[in-house]
């Protein structure tokens, strides 16, 4: 049976509990997170998208996960927050894409998930003002970050990391997380130290 063709694009935002800069990408997921384990929230603001005949324009979703040790060792606990405006068909499409069940970039991570925590619905609000951004999903997720700049005090472009192999985007902007609050699907994490990692980028995914 042929898989459903799909394509989505928009903006991706993430914070994690690792100190800035997160070591997991340059360490090829073989090194321990800076706090031993890592909790992360990857938020996706879909500007244009479809899953078969199901339109996904304007919706959002957040992938939450806890990795108990080095990411490459697996045994992640992961779940999804879907936009409460999504219909049942749209929610199913978001779940298939975000979990990797529909193929695409997230399929590369699906084998690392030991426990799927399920799907919860909430209003998801994205706010972007220049180098600052925030994502809020009711009382479940509330995170914000600001782009990281280099040593040149006159720089106008933020630091970027390229050729990452990250499923969200191969190239993204590094950011300092100003706050991260996650209380959803059995996961709990709060940080307002300003020392944690953030990153963001445009994203474009499609089925294989």
Residue positions per predicted region:
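N-terminal start-of-chain detector that recognizes signal peptides
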Residues: 13-17, 33-34, 50-55, 106-107, ...
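Charged linear interaction tracts used for macromolecular binding and regulation
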Residues: 76-159
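Noncatalytic linker/hinge segments flanking ATPase motor cores
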Residues: 54-62, 86, 120-126, 175-180
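Short C-terminal domain-edge/linker segments immediately following a structured domain
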Residues: 46-52, 75-76, 110-115, 156, ...
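Short, surface-exposed loop and linker segments with low hydrophobicity and enrichment for Pro/Ser/Thr
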Residues: 32-37, 69-74, 118-136, 173, ...
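Extended, charged low-complexity segments
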Residues: 151-208
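N-terminal ordered "arm"
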Residues: 2-49
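Aromatic- and glycine-enriched beta-alpha-beta binding-site module
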Residues: 36-107
């Amino acid at each position: 049976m042929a898989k459903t063709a799909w394509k989505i694009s928009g903006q991706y935002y993430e914070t994690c509990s690792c100190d800035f800069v997160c070591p997991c990408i340059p360490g090829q997921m073989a090194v321990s997170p800076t706090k031993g384990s890592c909790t992360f929230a990857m938020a996706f603001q879909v500007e244009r998208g479809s899953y078969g005949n199901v339109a996904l324009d304007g919706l959002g979703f957040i992938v939450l996960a806890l990795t108990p040790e080095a990411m490459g060792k697996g045994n992640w606990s992961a779940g999804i927050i879907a936009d409460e405006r999504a219909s049942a068909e749209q929610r199913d499409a978001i779940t298939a894409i975000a979990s990797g069940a529909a193929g695409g970039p997230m399929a590369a991570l699906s084998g690392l998930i030991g426990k799927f925590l399920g799907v919860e619905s909430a209003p998801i609000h994205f706010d972007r003002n220049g180098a600052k951004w925030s994502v809020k999903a009711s009382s479940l997720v509330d995170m914000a970050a600001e782009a990281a700049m280099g040593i040149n005090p006159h720089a106008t472009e933020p630091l970027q990391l390229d050729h990452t192999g990250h499923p969200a985007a191969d190239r993204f902007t590094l950011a300092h997380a100003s706050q991260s609050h996650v209380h959803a699907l059995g996961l709990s994490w709060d940080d307002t130290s300003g020392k944690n990692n953030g990153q963001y980028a445009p994203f474009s995914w499609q089925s294989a």
